[in-house]
């Protein structure tokens, strides 16, 4: 069946490479570019009063009325000199930032980054997407964390992150308005600092700029396409064009053991041979045949 699986619709420059995972997961869309939907330095709504806000049960949901909340550019906190908006010392703070997604179909992946002191829980359209490990399942408004956690970015570090694939993106994002809501908690009532710097970035199929630039420290993750099939000894891999003209093929050999690979050398034109050093995402020309 020469139509079993098609390569993703991307343009490869000359002499470039692409790695396909034979996982059976059938994920062909990979990002053409990354942009930020939400950045820490955007303007956020925040609540740090001594008592809970009105309609507290729905504070993290889209459509919640936060008109009487304070506003400020992030990060929002105190101490460490990593805050654009400095607040009075507090056990906790609630943050909200509404943003627009033009077309969810153009987003293949999401990455959420969290730089925090001391604990947090993040929600996207009311669904929890990431949390620190030092808070209870449903923390009270002024609950303290069970341990300390120091922010990373102010000393040159990289924030923690979690990545979401295409199926998860479809469950989390909406066309139009979306809300990122985050609660940040301190470890003690007399803590010298509180930090909340959060970023939500998207992998886009479109090469056209639509949102915000990614932060300078952002390193795009390696996202590989996954074929709809797996491989087993004796099966044959065939590459053909859309007219079913075969370009190349190979049967999976018996002798293909861990730490060996099989391919042509030089790349794409020489004889088939076993390589004693597999080179995924790299040329075969550096391997010993």
Which residues does each predicted region cover?
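Short proline/glycine-enriched turn/loop motifs at strand-loop junctions of beta-rich domains
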Residues: 115-118
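Intrinsically disordered, low-complexity linkers and terminal tails enriched in Ser/Thr/Pro/Gly
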Residues: 1-109, 121, 129-289
């Amino acid at each position: 069946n020469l139509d079993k699986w098609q390569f993703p619709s991307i343009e490869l420059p000359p002499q470039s490479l692409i790695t396909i995972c034979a996982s059976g997961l059938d994920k062909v869309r990979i990002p053409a570019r990354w942009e930020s939907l939400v950045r820490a330095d955007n303007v956020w709504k925040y609540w740090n009063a001594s008592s809970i806000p009105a309609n507290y049960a729905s504070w993290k949901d889209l459509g919640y009325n936060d008109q009487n909340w304070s506003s400020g550019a992030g990060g929002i906190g105190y101490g460490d000199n990593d805050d654009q908006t400095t607040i009075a010392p507090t056990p906790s703070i609630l943050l909200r930032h509404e943003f627009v997604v033009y077309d969810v179909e153009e987003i293949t992946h999401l990455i959420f980054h969290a730089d925090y002191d001391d604990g947090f829980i993040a929600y996207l359209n009311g669904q929890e997407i990431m949390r620190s490990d030092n808070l209870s399942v449903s923390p009270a408004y002024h609950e303290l964390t069970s341990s300390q956690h120091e922010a990373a970015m102010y000393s040159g570090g990289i924030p923690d992150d979690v990545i979401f694939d295409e199926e998860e993106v479809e469950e989390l994002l909406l066309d139009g308005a979306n809300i990122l809501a985050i609660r940040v908690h301190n470890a003690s009532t007399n803590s010298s600092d509180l930090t909340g710097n959060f970023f939500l970035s998207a992998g886009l199929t479109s090469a056209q700029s639509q949102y915000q630039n990614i932060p300078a420290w952002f390193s795009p993750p390696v996202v590989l396409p996954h074929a709809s099939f797996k491989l087993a000894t004796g099966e044959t891999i065939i590459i053909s064009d859309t007219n079913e003209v075969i370009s190349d093929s190979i049967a999976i050999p018996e002798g293909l053991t861990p730490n060996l690979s099989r391919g042509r050398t030089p790349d794409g034109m020489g004889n088939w041979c076993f390589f004693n050093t597999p080179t995924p995402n790299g040329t075969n020309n550096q391997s010993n045949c």
